C-alpha cells in the first residue's frame, strides 16, 4: 500500500486480530508504540513507520497489493455509483477516498448486511464468481411450511419466478439450488425467522424463493460472506479485513489462481 496513512486504531484492526475498539484500548494502556514512541488515539501511521505492540513489531502482510473493506450496508441504499431515481447510493456513506472501490456483488435496496468492496478487480471478480457461502437472517410473513423446507432441502425450479422480483426484471425463470443449511429460529402465523446459508447470489434469489410460497420477506440481513462475518459492526459503518481474514483471502486467491492455471 504505497503512500498509505491510517489512524492507529485502523492500522491495528487492519494488520492484527484486534477490532478498532480493542485497538483503542491497547493504545490507552500504553502497549502500542510508533517508531518507539507511545502512540496516542489520534496518531497516524504512515508508510515506513514501525509499529510495535507489546514490544513486538507488527509486520504488514507481505505482497498485499490490495485492500478490502467490510461495509454494513443499511436498508435504503443502492449498491451503485449513481441512481437516475436519485435514491441514496453506498458511495454517499463511504469516505471519498474509497470511491474507486468496487462492490463484490449486490445487496438489494431493501436489504442490509455484509457488503465487501475492494480496490482490486481481480479480488472482486474472484469473490463474486466463487461458490462461497452466504449466510442470512430472514424474517418472513407467516409460517415456515413443510413445502418450504422440502424446497430448501431439495432445490426448486420455477418457470415464473417474478414474484419477489423487481417489476422490470428481465429474469423470469430461476432455478434454486438446495440450501447449504437453514435453521428455523421462530415459526409463527404472523411472522417467522430463519437463518439460511446458500452459495449462490442470483438476483433477489431469496425474495423470489419465499414469494413463491406467498411468504413475503419482511427483513433480510446478510451476516456472513464466505470467511467474513458481520459480527458487531454497526449499520452504516465500515472496517478493513483483519489479519486472519486477509490470510484467508490470500489463501483463497492463491487457490483460485491455481485452479485457473490447471
Curated annotation (Swiss-Prot):
Pfam family, one: S4
EC numbers, comma separated: 5.4.99.-
Active site annotation, chain numbering: 108 (nucleophile)
Keywords from the UniProt entry: Isomerase, RNA-binding
Enzymatic class: isomerase
Domain S4 RNA-binding: start-end pairs: 6-70
GO MF annotation: an example: rRNA pseudouridine synthase activity
Transmembrane segments annotated in the record for this chain: none
Catalytically driven reaction(s): a uridine in RNA = a pseudouridine in RNA
Superkingdom of this protein's organism: Bacteria
Any Gene Ontology biological process: enzyme-directed rRNA pseudouridine synthesis
Family according to the record: Belongs to the pseudouridine synthase RsuA family.
Designated name of the protein: Uncharacterized RNA pseudouridine synthase HP_1459
Source species: Helicobacter pylori (strain ATCC 700392 / 26695)
Amino acid at each position: 500500500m504505497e503512500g498509505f496513512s491510517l489512524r492507529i486504531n485502523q492500522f491495528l484492526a487492519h494488520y492484527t486480530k484486534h477490532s478498532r475498539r480493542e485497538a483503542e484500548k491497547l493504545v490507552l494502556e500504553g502497549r502500542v508504540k510508533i517508531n518507539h514512541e507511545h502512540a496516542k488515539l489520534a496518531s497516524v501511521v504512515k508508510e515506513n513507520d514501525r509499529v510495535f505492540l507489546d514490544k513486538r513489531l507488527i509486520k504488514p502482510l507481505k505482497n498485499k497489493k490490495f485492500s478490502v473493506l467490510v461495509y454494513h450496508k443499511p436498508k435504503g441504499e443502492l449498491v451503485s455509483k449513481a441512481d437516475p431515481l436519485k435514491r441514496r447510493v453506498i458511495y454517499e456513506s463511504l469516505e471519498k477516498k474509497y470511491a474507486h472501490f468496487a462492490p463484490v456483488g449486490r445487496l438489494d435496496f431493501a436489504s442490509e448486511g455484509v457488503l465487501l468492496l475492494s480496490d482490486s478487480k481481480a479480488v472482486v471478480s474472484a469473490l463474486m464468481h466463487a461458490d462461497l457461502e452466504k449466510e442470512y437472517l430472514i424474517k418472513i410473513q407467516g409460517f415456515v411450511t413443510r413445502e418450504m423446507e422440502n424446497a430448501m432441502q431439495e432445490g426448486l425450479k420455477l418457470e415464473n419466478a417474478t414474484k419477489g422480483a423487481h417489476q422490470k426484471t428481465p429474469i423470469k425463470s430461476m432455478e434454486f439450488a438446495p440450501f447449504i443449511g437453514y435453521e428455523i429460529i421462530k415459526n409463527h402465523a404472523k411472522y417467522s425467522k430463519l437463518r439460511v446459508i446458500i452459495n449462490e447470489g442470483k438476483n433477489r434469489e431469496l425474495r423470489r424463493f419465499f414469494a413463491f410460497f406467498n411468504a413475503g420477506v419482511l427483513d433480510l440481513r446478510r451476516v456472513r460472506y464466505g470467511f467474513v462475518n458481520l459480527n458487531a459492526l454497526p449499520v452504516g459503518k465500515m472496517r478493513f479485513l483483519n489479519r486472519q481474514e486477509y490470510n484467508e483471502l490470500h489463501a483463497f486467491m492463491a487457490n483460485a489462481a491455481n485452479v485457473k492455471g490447471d
